[in-house]
């Protein structure tokens, strides 16, 4: 299938499903049978295991697996629970999610960077640090796809698997913890988490984790570099004489459009329309030779789009069950949310993990009576604030204060979506839990190849370039356990253990 036909099919599908999703109102969680969480577990286990058992079978059949399992909860909600609005709501979130990462994927594929100079350990650390910052501007997907090829080229004479692993650690995951330009934090932004709140709240955790991981990389790369220097010098000299090259710089404009579109909230379809327009503009104005140099094709984003149709559909019963039963499973402390979100992010995927534990925190702490009181205050524009006599009056006031601070336009309009009220309760009363969920989901996404969307894309690009990458379990045993787990344990000890 040609890229044009593929793009046309995706665009038409998005238009159709967007019309359905945005037509549905916001619905509350439904009481579901625990067995309905089974398709979610089966799909995520299949994603983690089946490609390593039979890669060819998986490549041929993963669309049927994802869509087939996804249809089970859709049918259950529509016909058994009579709550089709819940699926329409999650469809809206899926569309926002896939349009964002898809547009970043297309635009970043139109930028070709070639970096000249010597591949030294300090140069590599600098490039990774730049990538960490870029991940907060372009999203982890955009930064990863723009920088992985230059990173591979500059290290091509001494490239080892650990170079790519640490690239995944820093650029594809930990680096992007400060802004919601990409999953999983973008999903929280859609629920009402303010854009700049994350940066203001966790920058020091981000800095500590980043410094530790980069320091470990510097030690390992220094050892590798010394071994390389003892080898043939002509390889090093030939690299120094290669010219720097930048092509497709007009795509920076389209990246800016996508980033700016993240801030667009009304009308509800405009953000996605701007992103799709930017992606189309980038694709059709980029010279084919640039796409060829970047080995650009739609395969990776097609796989992500199809798999996440199944993930988003099957995770709804798990989200609803956790929201309504969080207390019964013993989740009470911020540290438990940190490790719980982290483990689920590492072994499954950090986007659904973030939503699962956000739902759990809402179910554990947010009382429907508080929501009703806050909605009354919003509708009356704060009238009667001093007359609140509930035993949870402070929580009500704190929630309304958070709404007024972070969502003044919604408060002024006199109507606030349920999810925004729920998130504002956490912001005003239990912000440590929201920090734990945010940090756990982003950081631990680096623990496996399937922890975050860009991980597999980066691995695939590296393998196409001839890099011998560690296996699924080799990645965990050689890098996650000795490097990441002690780092994340330190973050827990410093900020979440109490």
Predicted features by range, described:
Residues 143, 156-198, 202-203:
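Hydrophobic, small-residue-rich alpha-helical packing segments that form membrane-like cores
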Residues 2-109, 117, 204-323, 480, ...:
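Hydrophobic transmembrane alpha-helices of multi-pass small-molecule transporters
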Residues 105-115, 130-143, 171-179, 205-214, ...:
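Helix-loop-helix module between adjacent transmembrane segments
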Residues 122-174, 356-439, 465-470:
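Hydrophobic transmembrane alpha-helices that form the pore/transport pathway of multi-pass ion
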Residues 140-147, 183, 345-359, 441-459:
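Membrane-helix boundary/coupling elements in multi-pass transport proteins
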Residues 257-369, 373-398:
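Transmembrane helical segments that form the transport core of multi-pass membrane transport proteins
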Residues 178-179, 188, 196-239, 390-394, ...:
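Juxtamembrane and boundary regions of transmembrane helices in multi-pass small-molecule transporters
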Residues 80-153, 157:
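Long, structured ligand/cofactor-binding scaffold of large enzymes
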């Amino acid at each position: 299938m040609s890229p044009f036909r593929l793009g046309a099919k995706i665009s038409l599908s998005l238009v159709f499903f967007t019309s359905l999703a945005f037509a549905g109102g916001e619905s509350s969680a439904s009481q579901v049978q625990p067995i309905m969480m089974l398709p979610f577990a089966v799909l995520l286990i299949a994603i983690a295991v089946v490609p390593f058992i039979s890669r060819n079978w998986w490549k041929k059949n993963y669309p049927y697996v994802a869509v087939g399992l996804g249809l089970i909860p859709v049918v259950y909600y529509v016909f058994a629970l009579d709550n089709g609005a819940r699926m329409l709501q999650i469809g809206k979130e899926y569309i926002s999610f896939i349009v964002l990462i898809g547009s970043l994927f297309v635009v970043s594929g139109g930028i070709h960077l070639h970096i000249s100079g010597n591949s030294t350990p300090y140069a590599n650390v600098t490039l990774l640090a730049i990538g960490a910052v870029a991940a907060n501007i372009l999203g982890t997907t955009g930064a990863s796809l723009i920088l992985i090829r230059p990173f591979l080229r500059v290290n091509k004479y001494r490239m080892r698997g650990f170079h790519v692993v640490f690239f995944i650690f820093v650029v594809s995951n930990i680096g992007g913890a400060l802004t919601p330009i990409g999953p999983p934090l973008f999903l929280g932004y859609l629920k009402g988490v303010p854009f700049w709140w994350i940066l203001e709240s966790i920058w020091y955790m981000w800095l500590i984790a980043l410094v530790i991981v980069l320091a470990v990389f510097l030690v390992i790369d220094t050892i590798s570099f010394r071994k390389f220097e003892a080898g043939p010098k002509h390889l090093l000299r030939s690299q120094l004489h290669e010219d720097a090259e930048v092509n497709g710089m007009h795509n920076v404009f389209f990246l800016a459009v996508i980033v700016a579109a993240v801030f667009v909230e009304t009308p509800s379809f405009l953000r996605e329309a701007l992103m799709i327009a930017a992606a189309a503009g980038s694709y059709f104005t980029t010279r084919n030779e640039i796409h060829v140099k970047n080995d650009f094709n739609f395969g990776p984003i097609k796989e992500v789009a199809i798999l996440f149709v199944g993930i988003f559909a099957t995770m709804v019963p798990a989200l609803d069950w956790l929201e309504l039963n969080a207390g019964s499973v013993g989740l009470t402390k911020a540290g438990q949310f940190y490790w719980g979100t982290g483990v689920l992010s590492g072994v499954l995927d950090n986007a659904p993990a973030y939503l699962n534990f956000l739902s759990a925190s809402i179910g554990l702490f947010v009382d429907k009576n508080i929501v009703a009181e806050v909605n009354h205050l919003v509708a009356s524009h704060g009238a009667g604030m001093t007359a609140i006599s509930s035993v949870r009056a402070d929580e009500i006031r704190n929630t309304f204060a958070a709404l007024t601070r972070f969502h003044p336009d919604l408060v002024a309009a006199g109507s606030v979506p349920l999810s925004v009220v729920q998130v504002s309760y956490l912001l005003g009363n239990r912000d440590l839990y929201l920090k734990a969920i945010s940090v756990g989901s982003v950081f631990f996404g680096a623990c496996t190849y399937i922890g975050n969307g860009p991980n597999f894309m980066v691995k695939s690009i590296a393998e196409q370039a001839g890099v011998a990458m560690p296996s699924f379990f080799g990645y965990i045993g050689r890098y996650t356990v000795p490097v990441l787990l002690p780092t994340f344990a330190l973050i827990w000890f410093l900020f979440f253990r109490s």
